[in-house]
């Protein structure tokens, strides 16, 4: 079945599985980058505790780079899918070309931060000179060679928008394999390669990302034939850029808020380096679970957006129903794994003094996964139906308005010696349940105003 016909005619439940599985694997492998780095770094011969703390502190900036790349890609994805659904191939070519122009601008900003801003950022979260040195070295490499992750994110969304998510997953798998192979070689020093410690982890990560980006560039040029490829379409078009970010900016802010949340949580937990490290480790496991929901969301959005472009009320409703159902199934599996095996995750990271904090955090925070996954699915639905503001509000509730004040208040009692650090972890499930209730109300309103009103 041709790709455009598949998006139009294939039953939605089957289409979502076919598109969703590669995307889920792709997002899971993206989370593996950070988990693999932490696992290998945690087993370094010396300085592993400081190195794990350094990776915790650099994580918000890594997330921010991904946020801007993926958010721009999300806007491109939804707009391109809708444009193709309307049969406008010329505009589709401009959408794809402008997304690549935006990618170049994003890389220049990351490059400048990598050269001039990294050390000041790390120093704001710790006074330990070893952690500052390790964090600065790692993050500078990731920023200066960030073009891999930025352009991978864009090409991934361009392929997903045309229903070719399998190829984006192939690129992700190849990059992940390269990263995993290089990690022990560059971190520990094997054969002619010298021992580089955290620098080696950074080099392994960015090389894997560059390989993925190059492979997806080839797939994009050879397979996305629904529209023309030409550098003339990279000429900035204000109207198209505005449309991309009308959809994608809330996604960027949503992802950026995750970075802000992690950064502020690091500051809140600054009183206990072990708790700070534990938070960084469990957050990577949490992201691994939630990235399953993000992957499915990336199938939900183009399916519903394409259906919205062709005014198919039934396919939109099917997309919403199956998207939420499949998300809940994935999150139940995630809760089961994290509740049953927290000790095994701690052993993987060689968590040391942070072990008990890590296990306690996992058992409490995993309660929130089902509600968090539903919130992610809601946001994918909103983005497909021009509900960017609703998506932004859910992100603000989850990443800023509720969780940070709660965690700050709870930390006041913890620092006063009235109760253990575990109180802070309860801010996560409270936040997700509250946001989920608000998200349901938004979904009802969007369904009434956008879907039921279709002719």
Where are the regions that the model predicts?
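Helix-terminus/linker motif at the lipid-water interface of multi-pass membrane proteins
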Residues: 28, 32-53, 122-129, 185-196, ...
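Transmembrane helical elements of multi-pass membrane transporters/channels
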Residues: 18-37, 141, 175, 208-212, ...
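Short alpha-helical transmembrane segments in multi-pass integral membrane proteins
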Residues: 1-20, 80-147, 193-248, 304-368, ...
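Short runs within selected transmembrane alpha-helices of multi-pass transporters and secretion channels
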Residues: 73, 142-160, 168-176, 201-216, ...
